[in-house]
Amino acid sequence: MEIPKLLYITVIAIGLSGSLTCATPLANPWADPEAEANPEAKATAEAIAEALAEPEPALPALPLLAFLFSLPAVQHWVEKNWING
């Protein structure tokens, strides 16, 4: 089954329009220069900036990934040694 070229063009156009929309200041209400007059908006902007500045720790995901990637090896060992004898 061949994917039509129109679908590719549509996906690219939607992706570009979405990235351009996120780049405008209207999409970011916390980047509004008038927000400094409102203390609640300023506190919200500071909280968002602080949350975006802190990176997510990758350490909790590593043991889970190691476990999931080891499952095919364990399955192979069980089939070779226990099932097929």
Swiss-Prot record:
Cellular component per GO, a single term: extracellular region
Proregion residues excised on maturation: 24-57
Keywords on record: Amidation, Ion channel impairing toxin, Neurotoxin, Secreted, Signal, Toxin, Voltage-gated sodium channel impairing toxin
Tissue-level expression: Expressed by the venom gland.
GO MF: sodium channel regulator activity; toxin activity
Signal peptide span: 1-23
Subcellular location: Secreted
Disulfide bonds: none
Modified residues (Asparagine amide): N84
Primary localisation category: secreted
Similarity field: Belongs to the formicidae venom clade 1 family.
Known role: Vertebrate-selective toxin that causes pain by targeting voltage-gated sodium channels.
Protein name from the UniProt record: Myrmicitoxin(1)-Pr2d
Organism of this sequence: Pogonomyrmex rugosus
